[in-house]
């Protein structure tokens, strides 16, 4: 479980153990640790750069990443000059190319020659040298059926045609211009407590952005080969598929362990449908150009490079599940490098996790390495794993793995042209990516759909016009699936999801995590609101409120005993942010306000040995206070005993953590005479977190109430 904090340490590194950090161990005499000689040697050893596993070298881990260093370079401007010069030298007058619409019947399909799959895409100069004979399309009848299937369609009914194949240029121009000015939105209720906020660029005579449900998979415009193995629909599928298969940007904020497999099947089916339609169109048009000798026909059906779908996942095991879903929906006769893939990406679950929660097992089960990237190439009869990026149709990667493919050491750009023609981005388990390092995700999005620096063998005469105009980001579809919403995800939705055809945010209505506590006794839950002028000033306002109000009252009533556990001993302080954790830790170590308090520390950077020691001392009373971060809980899910009081310095992002942490109060020793207490600090900038804890019906009054700033639940 590699941990990467975006403000602490470098962005590189990987491993299978959690809680690694590059900072020195925090030491203070107030920790009252008698075994001071046992320093954080384990923590330092965890910081050593990992050794590559056998068979998992750059060529295999990176798969398609190794091709980024060795590609032939050609200046795209020089390529254009060559084309112009060749035309100028010709004695014959230039013929005007005739543009062929997708639904125009130019020639009989039965007259088309049988093209070669591996060579039909002029934009792919980096095809694999070991092309197999299976990539030759040797079945004319099969090819004819595929041409009819999905290519000769009514563009008004197929979202692929209206979005990518043949969009109305005038309407598209208006929508792109409106994207930077104003959006209009409509809110509608869905099923099971879900509701959608659908948005579209505000243009004249715009159609409604509320989409009807899709009753069955038959209503989807699928390739025939996919329709045969299409998934079954449940109520959630009928609500989501209109936005996903309609090429709208979609932000789904209710991902769970129960629906994650269904969501994965839905977006895999959509990605496959998009890739197959794109490749079949290129094959058909290449055949037309071959038949007509390419003289007077203009067919724009490509981007600058071949990769069309980017899927961002948190772990290698998640990648295994995704590839399994792809091959289930689109069975292939051959799967090249499958054994190599399973050996380097898959692993067995930990047998000692019987008591771990389902969300923990789903995320960290199997191979939880967060450093990987993989290219997938589809041919008629085979799927090739570990294909080079420039000859791949789908790229699957972790944020860290993809960033290291783009950057060199020192932040120097290495290569991002393979991201120039991405038409679909899928971010699954986004809440887990936030706990890794969200800055990597932001960096990847900043490198999408840029004009390429090199030609890469691109045939510019076949590049779609909106690519040449630099408008690809307005047609790219972005799908984000998360267990909950956060400010980081909201920022991504507002800044990077700029689909000219619209977008939708689908969210649940919360009952509140406070209603689902499993405690043997009832406890008083006190929420204290403090004033904060802006998100930037919120950390300072929170710290001042904590030290002057909460900690001051705590210190005055503290009664130390010889064992170090007094009246308010066994106090757990839960701190979501690591930077806030460092500030509170330093205050406990250096302030006279806490001079008589012994405390322990557990953060995501604390070694396993030191964490065990801190938990033991806290349970035995040698530490009166334990500082505990949200990311430490995310990666380790400790069961901390001896907790009599909880102070939440801030609300957790994950509502599951609320119940797990508050239920520590049920593990206090049976002889404890003090009544367990819970106090929570929040400001108006915590609205998203607060809604998940207290419920949608209560959050508004708690944020706007002017009669007081303290709210109590029993």
UniProtKB/Swiss-Prot annotation:
Region (Disordered): 1-120
Skewed-composition ranges (Basic residues): 1-23
Biological-process GO terms, alphabetical: maturation of SSU-rRNA from tricistronic rRNA transcript (SSU-rRNA, 5.8S rRNA, LSU-rRNA)
Domain of life of the source: Eukaryota
Pfam families cross-referenced by the UniProt entry: Utp25_C (PF06862), UTP25_NTPase-like (PF22916)
Location(s) in or outside the cell: Nucleus, Nucleolus
Matching InterPro entries: P-loop_NTPase, UTP25, UTP25_C, UTP25_NTPase-like
Positions of disulphide bridges: none
Keyword Ribonucleoprotein found: yes
Low complexity composition-biased segments: 57-66
Keywords: Nucleus, Ribonucleoprotein, Ribosome biogenesis, rRNA processing
Biased composition (Basic and acidic residues): 24-35
Any one GO CC term of the record: nucleolus
Major subcellular location class: nucleus
Molecular function as annotated in GO: rRNA binding; U3 snoRNA binding
Subunit and partners: Component of the ribosomal small subunit (SSU) processome composed of at least 40 protein subunits and snoRNA U3.
Family affiliation: Belongs to the UTP25 family.
Role played: DEAD-box RNA helicase-like protein required for pre-18S rRNA processing, specifically at sites A0, A1, and A2.
Identification of the protein by name: U3 small nucleolar RNA-associated protein 25
Organism from which the protein derives: Arthroderma otae (strain ATCC MYA-4605 / CBS 113480)
Lineage, opening ranks: Eukaryota, Fungi, Dikarya, Ascomycota, Pezizomycotina
